[in-house]
Amino acid sequence: MHRNLLRIPTLLALVLCLLLPALAHANLLAKILAPKPDLWSRWTAHDASSERRIDHSAWDRFLDSYLSEGPDGVVRIAYGSVSRPDRAALRAYIASLAAAPISTYARAEQFAFWVNLYNAQTVSTILEHYPVQSIRDIDISPGLFADGPWGKKLLAIEGESVSLDDIEHRILRPIWQEPRVHYAVNCASIGCPNLLRSAFTAENTERLLTQGAIAYVNHPRGVKIADGALTLSSIYAWFEGDFAAEGGVMAHVRRYADPELATALESIDEASAFEYDWRLNDASSVRG
């Protein structure tokens, strides 16, 4: 979830705050720095009548082999344990997706395609640079103030060079306008919603999106109340506009909150703070 903001160095952020005191509030500054949906209209092409399906079984096998949930409820990947054959299989899976004429598929199949491609490419990129403490340490994006891999054109789809940023902010967010997409794309960080254990498909997308929303909202890294003060994941500040159609972030959070959390939220109108943990979601970090 994750992903191409907060890339401005600390010094520049400090200068911004000094020059623009009204923006010093972290939430307000985050909103301004956050990437907005920017439609790449070339990817709106689809065939509503298509019944073709893409095989994501290779991604399912990878997830089944290397994902584990820690005692803290965070799903991590055993990056250091991924075998050479499985690395090659992951690259082959990504290549198979890149070769698909995705513009000829139906919308539901396209959504699953882009989410799985984003997540698989993110994991593959981590593996290429592992070990790292954070995905932000993979400094391959172009631009003076960029960090992380999100801005680099890592993929070629239907003759177009495509980055992870393109997939999230120019394809998924503007075309589907689905706030739960933030529970689907994974930025390989502890603070991010869990990478789900199953590949997305046209048939299971709705279930997985709801599952992801419930899991994140009801985990402390998504929503946390202490001494009557509400702390939310920075995702809800960065992408606040994506939740507007549901009545805003608070309405969205209440919708997916378990009964106990929902009751606690009744007397709270807004968050007091936002936080995010950019440490890598590496299974080795919780080994005894």
What is each of the regions a protein language model found here?
Residues 9-21:
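Bacterial N-terminal signal peptides
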Residues 1-5:
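N-terminal secretory signal peptides that target proteins for export/translocation
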